[in-house]
């Protein structure tokens, strides 16, 4: 995707801390995905020098841990329901981390944080398209794709593929 096209999209991060066979998730309280389980992340701030900085800052803000070894495992373009005008078109950079400092603590954005066994995730507690990429990322695959939602959050179109074309996936 060219830089001119990327400029028309909101950039965001999503991080999944992993400990052994479990992933840290929490219930999102605001914006896209409110009421559903998810990892931790958000949009860049002017002080962030890279998308890795955004990932580290947002994970610290939302769950209180400082990730040490984040790996970029995915890049997905989302076309969200029209009610989210500012967040309608997004490029989400998806990370995993297996090392961090601190203990998870809840925030006003993320509640009910808990460790979930990766092989037992109940995807009825996630946004509909999450089942298309989260299991692959948590199993170590790197993915790129596009997901388009209808206004009722049903999946309109999707295309997810394994890639080696990300910084941490060569």
PLM regions and their residue ranges:
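Short connector loops/turns at beta-strand edges and beta->alpha or beta->beta junctions
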Residues: 29-32
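Short, active-site-adjacent segments that bind or coordinate small-molecule cofactors and metal centers
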Residues: 137-159
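Unchanged
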Residues: 44-68, 79-136, 157-170
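Conserved N-terminal beta-strand and adjoining loop/helix that marks the start
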Residues: 1-24, 43-44
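Short, solvent-exposed loop/turn elements at beta->coil junctions and helix N-caps
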Residues: 3, 75-82
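A positional/architectural concept
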Residues: 34-38
């Amino acid at each position: 995707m060219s830089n001119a096209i990327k400029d028309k999209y909101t950039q965001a991060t999503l991080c999944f801390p992993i400990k052994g066979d479990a992933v840290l998730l929490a219930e999102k309280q605001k914006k896209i995905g409110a009421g559903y389980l998810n990892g931790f992340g958000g949009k860049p701030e002017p002080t962030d020098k890279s998308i890795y900085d955004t990932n580290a800052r947002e994970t610290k803000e939302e769950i209180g841990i400082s990730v040490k070894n984040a790996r970029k495992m995915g890049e997905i373009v989302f076309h969200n329901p029209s009610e989210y005008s500012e967040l309608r078109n997004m490029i989400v950079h998806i990370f995993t981390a297996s090392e961090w400092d601190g203990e998870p603590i809840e925030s006003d954005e993320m509640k009910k944080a808990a460790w979930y066994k990766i092989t037992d995730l109940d995807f009825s507690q996630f946004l509909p398209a999450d089942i298309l990429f989260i299991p692959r990322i948590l199993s170590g695959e790197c993915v790129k794709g596009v997901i388009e939602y209808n206004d009722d959050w049903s999946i309109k179109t999707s295309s997810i593929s394994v890639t080696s074309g990300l910084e941490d996936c060569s």
